[in-house]
Amino acid sequence: MHLSPQEKDKLLIVTAALLAERRLQRGLKLNHPEAVAWLSFLVLEGARDGKNVADLMQEGSTWLSRDQVMEGIPELVDEVQIEAVFPDGTKLVTLHDPIR
């Protein structure tokens, strides 16, 4: 199997996001890489499900709360940008202050 660098990046995001999901289910707080991976994964999956950029940007601030991440993480993650594939092409989705 030959994967492009972009495909490898997406697989790494999915792996980290699945770990983050398991930790959230166990009641653990996410660190910086886990929080970013989780948010990125939800954008990628939302695009795959047919949601549009505006909806994902709006929903993005509801996916993680301050109580679900380690201290100081909301301030570190002031913006998350991820390129996602939509039915009409690849678009950049930006989540502003996604952890509230």
From Swiss-Prot:
Pathway listed for it?
Nitrogen metabolism; urea degradation; CO(2) and NH(3) from urea (urease route): step 1/1
Q: Which GO terms describe its cellular component?
A: cytoplasm
> Which SUPFAM superfamilies does the record match to this protein?
Urease, gamma-subunit
- Superkingdom of source: Bacteria
Keyword terms: Cytoplasm, Hydrolase
User: What catalytic activity is recorded?
Assistant: urea + 2 H2O + H(+) = hydrogencarbonate + 2 NH4(+)
Which E.C. number(s) belong to this protein?
A: 3.5.1.5
| Enzyme class name | hydrolase
Q: GO terms for biological process? A: urea catabolic process
Q: Where in the cell is it found?
A: Cytoplasm
Family per record: Belongs to the urease gamma subunit family.
Write the protein's name: Urease subunit gamma
